[in-house]
Regions:
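Transmembrane alpha-helices and adjacent helix-loop boundaries
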Residues: 2-378
Length: 378
C-alpha cells in the first residue's frame, strides 16, 4: 500500500522531471497492458473475469464518488442507475423486442437516460441531508429493482424475475468480443478483449472525474460538502450543482451498466439489489472518499478480496482442522466483514485518503482527547 502511494505520489511531485514522470507512466502502462495475460496464465480465466468486474466496479465507484465524495450527498440507491444502463442495453440489443442496436448508439442513450433518472432522484431530495437522504435514495433503488422485477405483465417488457437472456455481446461491426479475436500473429481471448474495452472506458471516466474535480463545478461541490449554507451565501447555485452531481454520477453508472449487460449477456433484477449499492459505497468509503486514486484502489481491493476469501475459506479449514467445519461461503463473508471492521477501526479516513481528509480526521481526533494524550498517526 505504501509503495503504491509513493509510486503515484512521484507522478505528482515531480511534474518537471520528464524522465521520472514518463518512466513511471510507462511502467504503469506496461503493467496494465500485460496484466490480463499474466492473470490468465498464472491464475486462469476465473480471475481474469474477476479482473474485468473489478474495472466495472471502478467505474461505478468513481460515479458514486462524485455524489458522496465530491458533493457529500449520501446515496444508498446508486445501483439503480447501473440497472437502468444494463436494462436499456438488454432491451435494445436482444431478442426481447427484436432489436439489435450497436454499442455506439446504446451507450450514449443508456448514459443519458441514467443521468435523467439521477436528476429525477435529486430534484425531490434537494433539501435532504444525511440519514434522511440515505433513506430516500435507498427507497429509490429498491423501487427501480421491484419495478424491473414486475414489469412482465400485462405487457412483458423486462421478462420479470427471469431476466433477459441472449443479449448481444459488445461488437464493432462484424467483430464480436464474445469470440476470440484473430489478430493474425496471435489470438486474443474474449475475456482479454473485454478487459481492454473496460480499461479504456475506465480511463475515460477517470479523466472526466479528474477534470470535474479540478473545475469550478468540482470546487462548488466541495463547498457544498463542507458547508452548504456558506456555499449558498457565496453565490453558488446549490440546487443546480447538486442536481449536476446526481446526473454525472448516474451517467457513469449507466455506462458501466451497459457494458455489464454486453459482457454478461444476461440481466435480472437480482443483480441490482441493496447489497450491491452497499458494496459500491464501501469501495468509496474504505478507499478514501473524494480521493480518486483511493476510490480506484478501494474498488479493486473490495472486488478481489471477497473472491480471495472464497478460494481460501475451505482449504484453510481443511489444513487446520482436517475437515470443513463452517460453510465456506459463510466463513468468506465473516472474514470479509472482519476485514472491513478492522479497516474502519484503524483507518477511519480510508486506506488512501486525500491529504485534506487525513488532516480533517486528525483534527477531530485531537479535539476529542486531552492535550497531554498523544494521538496515533494515521
Amino acid at each position: 500500500m505504501k509503495m503504491t502511494a509513493r509510486f503515484f505520489a512521484r507522478l505528482t511531485r515531480h511534474p518537471n522531471d520528464d524522465r521520472v514522470h514518463w518512466l513511471a507512466w510507462a511502467l504503469l502502462g506496461l503493467l496494465l497492458a500485460t496484466l490480463p495475460w499474466l492473470v490468465a496464465e498464472g491464475f486462469g480465466n476465473t480471475w481474469l473475469r474477476i479482473l474485468n468486474f473489478a474495472l466495472l466496479y471502478v467505474m461505478l465507484a468513481l460515479g458514486l464518488n462524485i455524489v458522496v465524495g465530491f458533493a457529500g450527498l449520501l446515496d444508498m440507491g446508486y445501483i439503480a442507475f447501473y440497472a437502468v444502463g444494463a436494462y436499456l442495453w438488454a432491451l435494445l440489443a436482444s431478442p426481447q423486442f427484436g432489436l439489435h442496436w450497436p454499442m455506439w448508439a446504446i451507450l450514449p442513450i443508456g448514459a443519458g437516460v441514467a443521468g435523467l433518472f439521477g436528476v429525477l432522484l435529486g430534484a425531490p431530495t434537494l433539501k435532504l441531508r444525511g440519514d434522511y437522504l440515505a433513506i430516500v435514495t435507498l427507497g429509490f433503488g429498491e423501487i427501480i429493482r421491484i419495478f424491473l422485477n414486475n414489469l412482465n405483465a400485462p405487457i412483458n417488457i423486462t421478462n420479470g424475475p427471469q431476466g433477459i437472456s441472449a443479449i448481444d455481446a459488445v461488437h464493432f461491426g462484424s467483430i464480436s468480443l464474445a469470440r476470440p479475436l484473430d489478430l493474425g500473429f496471435m489470438t486474443m481471448p474474449s475475456l482479454v478483449s473485454y478487459y481492454y474495452l473496460f480499461l479504456f472506458a475506465a480511463l475515460i471516466i477517470i479523466g472526466i472525474a479528474i477534470r470535474l474535480e479540478r473545475s469550478r463545478v468540482g470546487r462548488a461541490w466541495a463547498a457544498i460538502r463542507e458547508d452548504e449554507v456558506a456555499a449558498k451565501a457565496c453565490g453558488i447555485n446549490t440546487r443546480n450543482v447538486k442536481l449536476l452531481a446526481f446526473a454525472m454520477g448516474a451517467t457513469f453508472g449507466g455506462v458501466a451498466g451497459g457494458l455489464f449487460a454486453g459482457f454478461q449477456q444476461f440481466v435480472s433484477p437480482e443483480s441490482f439489489g441493496l447489497l450491491e449499492s452497499v458494496m459500491v459505497l464501501c469501495m468509496v468509503v474504505l478507499g478514501g472518499m473524494g480521493h480518486i486514486p483511493g476510490v480506484i484502489f478501494g474498488a479493486l481491493l473490495l472486488t478481489v478480496l471477497p473472491e480471495f476469501f472464497r478460494h481460501i475459506a475451505g482449504p484453510v479449514q481443511q489444513s487446520l482442522f482436517g475437515s470443513v467445519l463452517v460453510d465456506p461461503e459463510s466463513l468468506r463473508m465473516l472474514m470479509f466483514g472482519l476485514a472491513l471492521v478492522l479497516v474502519m477501526r484503524y483507518r477511519p479516513s480510508g486506506l488512501w485518503p486525500s491529504p485534506q481528509r487525513r488532516r480533517e480526521i486528525e483534527d477531530v481526533q485531537r479535539a476529542d482527547v486531552p492535550a497531554d494524550v498523544p494521538v496515533s498517526p494515521m
